[in-house]
Amino acid sequence: MPYKIFVTRSIPDAGIKLLQANKNVSLDIYERDQQIPRKELLRRVRGADIILSILTERMDKEVMDAAGPQLKMIANYAVGFDNVDVKEAARRKIVVTNTPHERV
């Protein structure tokens, strides 16, 4: 069964192509270059194994609850991770990463 990855905003095509090349990945991408409305974020993360987020989206307990217990990783497409509740993620054994160079 493929990993479900939800991408919270448009990222460079090279990154999307890299993810699409993996046959073990099912992608759901919020295709707009603006912040996803919170209600839509909570709906679309359901069942995600991985959330690829942008710094403007809060990755907190509410998002982790909405995603479900199978959530394994929050990959932040940003230099930092101030938007992620790292303590809550650690409690759930969810890996949190960032991209210090922000280039694909």
Model-derived segments and spans:
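Phosphate/diphosphate ligand-binding glycine-rich loop within oxidoreductases
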Residues: 48-104
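N-terminal glycine-/charge-rich "phosphate-binding" loop or analogous flexible N-terminal tail
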Residues: 1-48
